[in-house]
From Swiss-Prot:
<comment type="subunit">
    <text>Tetramer. Dimer. Interacts with RETN.</text>
</comment>
<keyword id="KW-1015">Disulfide bond</keyword>
<keyword id="KW-0929">Antimicrobial</keyword>
<feature type="disulfide bond">
    <location>
        <begin position="70"/>
        <end position="85"/>
    </location>
</feature>
<feature type="disulfide bond">
    <location>
        <begin position="68"/>
        <end position="96"/>
    </location>
</feature>
<keyword id="KW-0295">Fungicide</keyword>
<keyword id="KW-0044">Antibiotic</keyword>
<comment type="function">
    <text>Effector molecule of the innate immune system that acts via antibiotic-like properties against a broad array of infectious agents including bacteria, fungi, and viruses or by promoting the activation and maturation of some APCs. Interacts with the essential precursor of cell wall synthesis lipid II to inhibit bacterial cell wall synthesis. Inhibits adenovirus infection via inhibition of viral disassembly at the vertex region, thereby restricting the release of internal capsid protein pVI, which is required for endosomal membrane penetration during cell entry.</text>
</comment>
<dbReference type="Pfam" id="PF00323">
    <property type="entry name" value="Defensin_1"/>
</dbReference>
<dbReference type="GO" id="GO:0071222">
    <property type="term" value="P:cellular response to lipopolysaccharide"/>
</dbReference>
<dbReference type="InterPro" id="IPR016327">
    <property type="entry name" value="Alpha-defensin"/>
</dbReference>
<dbReference type="GO" id="GO:0002227">
    <property type="term" value="P:innate immune response in mucosa"/>
</dbReference>
<dbReference type="InterPro" id="IPR002366">
    <property type="entry name" value="Alpha-defensin_N"/>
</dbReference>
<dbReference type="InterPro" id="IPR006081">
    <property type="entry name" value="Alpha-defensin_C"/>
</dbReference>
<protein>
    <recommendedName>
        <fullName>Neutrophil defensin 1</fullName>
    </recommendedName>
</protein>
<dbReference type="GO" id="GO:0051673">
    <property type="term" value="P:disruption of plasma membrane integrity in another organism"/>
</dbReference>
<keyword id="KW-0964">Secreted</keyword>
Amino acid sequence: MRTLVILAAILLVALQAQAEPLQARTDEATAAQEQIPTDNPEVVVSLAWDESLAPKDSVPGLRKNMACYCRIPACLAGERRYGTCFYLGRVWAFCC
């Protein structure tokens, strides 16, 4: 029984030791994203669009009035994913 308790304690210490560097990396990534230069007004956004998923013209004017957004991690309720956005080195869902 003592052996089991000692092994469990060692496991918990090992997991905690691994969690701290992970949290540090997450903090560094967040800090890097917050340091977006404001002096460069040019932003590059790359979109990948799948035409087979495009809404059909069964409802006139649907495409003209459709609003699309790049979202993480997924589309909101009522939206549909039509492709992928690549922005700031991350992959976003292209939702309409």
